[in-house]
From Swiss-Prot:
Amino acid composition bias (Basic and acidic residues), ranges on this chain: 1-18
Quaternary structure and interacting proteins, as annotated: Forms a heterotrimer with H2A.Z-H2B, stabilizing the association of the histone dimer.
Function: Forms a chaperone-bound H2A.Z-H2B complex that acts as a source for SWR1 complex-dependent H2A to H2A.Z histone replacement in chromatin.
Main location: cytoplasm
The protein's name: Histone H2A.Z-specific chaperone chz1
Amino acid sequence: MSEEPKKIDIKGKGRAIEDLIPDIDDEEDDVDFQDLSSSGESDDSDDSMQEDYDDIHDEEPEDYSAIDPTNIMCSTRTRRKKIDFTKVLEEGQNEDDFEEEDEDYIPPQDKTM
């Protein structure tokens, strides 16, 4: 079965507009970029690229101990103390007795004076 392209009927008025951006013939199309290099002696060899890679990766390995949740430290209330995640309140347990003190909380003042 041969597929014929479907013809689309376009209703309304339309007109073709000439391309308003003229084609500019660049005279510099055939430029040799090797001649334009400033030093003329760029070292793109695999050896130099490997040296750059090795220089970057010669640093000390990252310390991933901070990512371990058992090593998380708080900077204010529990300074230099490890957080014990085994004592976290379970949902619905002692919610009424648990109040967190807010260091920045300022109680409202009576304005009846």
